[in-house]
Amino acid sequence: MEKEQIVKTIETICNTDANDGITFKVIDATDIRQEDKYGGFQVRVLGKLENIRHEFVIDIATGDPVVPSERNYKYTCLVTGEVLPLKVYSLESVISEKLQTVLSRSVANSRSKDYYDLYILRETQLDNVDIKTLKEAFKQTCNYRNYSIAKEDAISLLDEIENNQQVKNRWETYTKKVKYADGVDFESVVSDIKKWINDLY
């Protein structure tokens, strides 16, 4: 997986004219997940529609275990109503990867969205998660990333995260910036993450 080829492919997609007035331009690409066997890249893209400008990122990686397997998902385009078939991660693998990231990065994790995702998945998708599959997904994710942690250490780490002022400040900034997270207190978020941990051990 070469960075130059990835950027070239995304630039080709960005340059495709959909006759909708929206343009996309690749800004840059940086290395991510260097601790993984294959690593990955984060590509920043600028989207423009008349006077509206929006920057977003695309994370690209390979080699991650997906347990039990990828899922088929039909995405409905908000603008045209077109239904697009996609291959997506299982819920169990999404949760496992985010849990491992939160635990391994600890208070240094600057992505408040990781915390929010684990919270909202607990609140809205718990009935769709198979706990046995989740345990296997977490095990394989940790093995792939050469990471291990005991339950009591994970809970202790989450206590440290919950009480860290910098983490709480970043969370406050995030909830003010992102409408859907407005009003969600960090204590409730960490409480739900601990529930995921209790499910795993």
What residue spans do the PLM features occupy?
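Structured mid-to-C-terminal alpha-helical surface segments
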Residues: 1-201
